[in-house]
């Protein structure tokens, strides 16, 4: 049987391993821009439609079930949730090597319109104005593909010159040949987008597929000049 320590050791030996070998913790939820942690360490953010599987993907990346709260209710994540390697507070003078940011889902939420509008403003302000944001991982449900609202978010990222990469989630829910075709089709859809990273990554949080590739991509994003 593989233990958590065994899995961590195995991750350490892979391209994305060293940043993910240490346990990760939640440090704060950010309901408004004024509550953001000090700028300094590089950040990568996870964006996508509500219920696309952001929290499950983050849990899979760091190998810790339940770190990012998952829910069957779309729109449950209402803040920018910050996660860092254990041993850092995220405060000035005790900054981590990097941070993962789980963003509120867009496109649907079981909440009053005013609240949804506030989340939307927070997300857009963060994407446009966070200097330490190195890359956004835009999550797309493999069963549904890119929707109009995803294209609107890509338009925003392109106009703000924020680097982003498409990550297909729940790839285990469709057949393998369909995944290969979807990766190719998605790559073609973003080829002319100026801020889009050309490589599309297919993942399954449930099966662990594509997670090591995504870890390596994150490490490259935060360490490349």
UniProtKB/Swiss-Prot annotation:
CDD domains (alphabetical): YihA_EngB (cd01876)
Cofactor: Mg(2+)
InterPro entries to which the protein is assigned, alphabetical: G_ENGB_dom (IPR030393), GTP-bd (IPR006073), GTP-bd_ribosome_bio_YsxC (IPR019987), P-loop_NTPase (IPR027417)
Binding-site residues, GTP: 48-55, 75-79, 102-105, 169-172, 203-205
Residue ranges of domain EngB-type G in the record: 40-224
An example Gene Ontology CC term for this record: cytosol
Binding annotation for Mg(2+): 55, 77
Highest taxon of source: Bacteria
Entry GO MF terms: GTP binding; metal ion binding
Keyword match Transcription regulation: no
Role this protein plays: Necessary for normal cell division and for the maintenance of normal septation.
Classification via HAMAP family: GTPase_EngB (MF_00321)
Assigned protein family: Belongs to the TRAFAC class TrmE-Era-EngA-EngB-Septin-like GTPase superfamily. EngB GTPase family.
Protein's recorded name: Probable GTP-binding protein EngB
Source species of the chain: Chelativorans sp. (strain BNC1)
């Amino acid at each position: 049987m593989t233990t958590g320590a065994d899995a961590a050791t195995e991750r350490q030996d892979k391209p994305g391993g060293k940043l993910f070998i240490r346990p990760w913790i939640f440090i704060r939820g950010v309901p408004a821009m004024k509550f953001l942690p000090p700028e300094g360490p590089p950040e990568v953010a996870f964006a996508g439609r509500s219920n696309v599987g952001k929290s499950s993907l983050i849990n899979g990346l760091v190998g810790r079930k339940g770190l990012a709260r998952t829910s069957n209710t779309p729109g449950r994540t209402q803040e920018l949730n910050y996660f860092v390697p254990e041993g850092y507070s995220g405060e000035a003078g005790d900054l981590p090597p990097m941070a993962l940011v789980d963003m509120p889902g867009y496109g649907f939420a079981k909440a009053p319109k005013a609240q949804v509008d506030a989340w939307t403003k927070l997300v857009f302000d963060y994407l446009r104005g966070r200097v330490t944001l190195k890359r956004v991982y835009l999550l797309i449900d493999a069963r549904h593909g890119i929707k109009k609202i995803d294209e609107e978010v890509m338009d925003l990222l392109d106009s703000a010159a924020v680097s982003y990469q498409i990550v297909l989630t729940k790839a285990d829910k469709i057949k393998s040949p369909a995944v290969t075709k979807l990766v190719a089709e998605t790559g073609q859809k973003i080829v002319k987008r100026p801020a889009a990273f050309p490589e599309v990554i297919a993942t399954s949080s449930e099966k662990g597929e594509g997670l090591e590739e995504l870890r390596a991509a994150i490490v490259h994003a935060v360490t490349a000049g």
